[in-house]
Amino acid sequence: MWGLVRLLLAWLGGWGCMGRLAAPVPAWAGSRGHSGPTLLRTRRSWVWNQFFVIEEYSGPEPVLIGKLHSDVDRGEGRTKYLLTGEGAGTVFVIDEATGNIHVTKSLDREEKAQYVLLAQAVDRASNRPLEPPSEFIIKVQDINDNPPVFPLGPYHATVPEMSNVGTSVIQVTAHDADDPSYGNSAKLVYTVLDGLPFFSVDPQTGVVRTAIPNMDRETQEEFLVVIQAKDMGGHMGGLSGSTTVTVTLSDVNDNPPKFPQSLYQFSVVETAGPGTLVGRLKAQDPDLGDNALVAYSILNGEGSEVFSISTDSQGQDGLLTVRKPLDFETRRSYTFRVEATNTLIDPAYLRRGPFKDVASVRVTVQDAPEPPAFTQATYHLAVPENKAPGTLVGQISASDLDSPASPIRYSILPHSDPERCFSIEPEDGTIRTAVRLDREARVWHNLTILATELDSSAQSSRVQVAIQTLDENDNAPQLAEPYDIFVCDSAAPGQLIKVIRALDRDEVGNSSQVSLQGPVGPDANFTVRDNRDGSASLLLPSRPAPPRQAPYLIPIELWDWGQPALSSTATVTVSVCRCRPDGSMASCWPEAQLSPTGLSTGALLAIVTCMGTLLALVVLFVALRRQKQEALMVLEEEDVRENIITYDDEGGGEEDTEAFDITALQNPDGAAPPAAGPPVRRDVLPRTRAPRQPRPPGPADVVQLLALRLREADEDPSVPPYDSVQVYGYEGRGSSCGSLSSLGSGSEAGGVPGPAEPLDDWGPLFRTLAELYGAKEPPAP
């Protein structure tokens, strides 16, 4: 049996061993002479110590921190020690022969506080485990190598001004990465480095508090406090860190408003209307926001009735405005007091009040030219209708309030009385009618009267005058509408045919009740019964007569009850018709069959159809004629004969390409008569002609014809020759024939009767000319 002892030894130079631990372990052993294995209880010779490695320790060589040893190791070199686990082979190495464990670099507890490893002894030759692996821990022992830090710094805090001593402002917290369970490396103490005597800090909790009372924001609004955290309980040698706390004092309403001056003086012209700004007052309040809001008011007195004051929402100014019209002649100055008060008052600071202030205000009224003032804002007048022109309607009056007063002149603005129904006296404002008024045409007349100062036409004012036309009984009653009624021939006696209504254009209440009466007597075909409400019922007294061509005309008399009473007569038309069983009209003989001209409906339709057909034919014919005329006119407009130039001539001069005026060709009858004076020659481009067939009778006739055409061309060059041969005095440069002057007219100087050489030699272009001048017969075809 092999007994194993595991020893963890501490290095004498400062590495600590925490104790020895012995534990029995079972071991298997074989005995000669026994048939099976025998279980023996042997002593497990392990001594277990926990390792501690000081962090940040470093040396020139790896540091021995412990040793592994087994009692099976006889020192013969047959045992090999193995180390596995966290950091084995890199941070920790083991000597396989001796079991010494070394650390190869300095360790940081804040990165890793402990390492768990496995140790095992094996046979060097066969690598057979001599014992099971055993786990042990190497702890990194902390040292004070980390200063406190404030992870949330720098801090910003707010505390109300005028806070009591000890008011909590903010809590700061520092963090120390060292081991809080080992020594005082992580025990922190807070102190104030800068910010005394205004603030203090709790050494243990880091709560910052106010240290003095009545800190005023208006004196100092912001404070910078420096807080330090020191480990090792604040003792010497400890590490420290600091942060800043910016403390801002928030505003409270601890200051009343104050007027910078006790008396304000303003001036305003008397013509300033209500709402006109007189001046601004400013009560100063050093507080902020809602705590600085100020409300202004006028204390009881003479000023509160004439002036008003409000607060400007932007600048917190007091806006003094006019409330009622001012009059320099009545009062020239006002003196009153204005109070400024905080709108929000904190009861906690009433001891610093009162939160209001008072100032005096004096307003001087300045004189200004004023327009005339009417005695009333509007005037309402009345005049009866049908009165003669010049009837008095009423009078208006205006006065000049200035001193001295100026005379007033009155006039009616034309746009308010376009029909010139009224007139006004310019000096006293008396209004009279200019025409007879009719209430039924227009009830109200709205005039605009202009009052102007005689000394200053710029000073004027206007007033509205409403004139009502009063009613008189001047309209006779009449029927509300024309009545054209039909009644069935089968109607029963006493049947109501129609309710006839009357209309009186006079005003209701002016005896406008209307009575109606129809024909009376035994011969009356219809009965009219007055309903005494402005209407009458038309009744059938007996069975109606058979239908007839002419309708019944019933006279109706209408009268009112005015003074004097007015009456009129109207006619109601009643036709007797045949009706269907449902009561609707079927026909009224003969009006239903004939038109007013005596023609039937079918005849009228036939006549209208024929007239429409004839009218359509006429329109179609005119349209076709217009279309044909337009087509001819288009061809005439597009006549381009004057632009056609023949280029197959023998000449080459520019004068040969000039076209003649086409106007005379288009209108030969309108050609101008031959002009007086010397003959003017006009050369035009010759055109190629085909040989004439048959041949002219003789050369003498042709010569006579050419002479006639030549004379016409010489006397009237504006008329182009249609059928004549043009004679050129010069063929143009570059021609193989030279000049053709020998063919010039007889009127030219030096002209000869014929060409000097045979024309047949000149080619086919001159064949016609050769035939005209030649004596021989043309060649046979």
From Swiss-Prot:
Which stretches make up the Cadherin domain? Answer: 46-150, 151-259, 260-374, 375-479, 479-592
Q: Does the record bear 4Fe-4S in its keywords?
A: no
Q: Name one GO cellular component term.
A: cell-cell junction
- Propeptide residues, per UniProt? 23-44
Q: Which cysteines are joined by disulfide bonds?
A: none
State the Gene Ontology BP annotations. cell-cell adhesion; homophilic cell adhesion via plasma membrane adhesion molecules
* PROSITE patterns reported in the protein's UniProt record: CADHERIN_1, CADHERIN_2
The record's listing under Pfam families reads: CADH_Y-type_LIR, Cadherin
Task: List the ranges whose topology is Cytoplasmic.
Answer: 625-781
Q: What does this protein do?
A: Cadherins are calcium-dependent cell adhesion proteins. They preferentially interact with themselves in a homophilic manner in connecting cells; cadherins may thus contribute to the sorting of heterogeneous cell types. Cadherin-24 mediate strong cell-cell adhesion.
What is written about domains in the entry's comments?
Three calcium ions are usually bound at the interface of each cadherin domain and rigidify the connections, imparting a strong curvature to the full-length ectodomain.
Write down what this protein is called.
Cadherin-24
Task: Name the species this protein comes from.
Answer: Mus musculus
What gene makes this protein? Cdh24
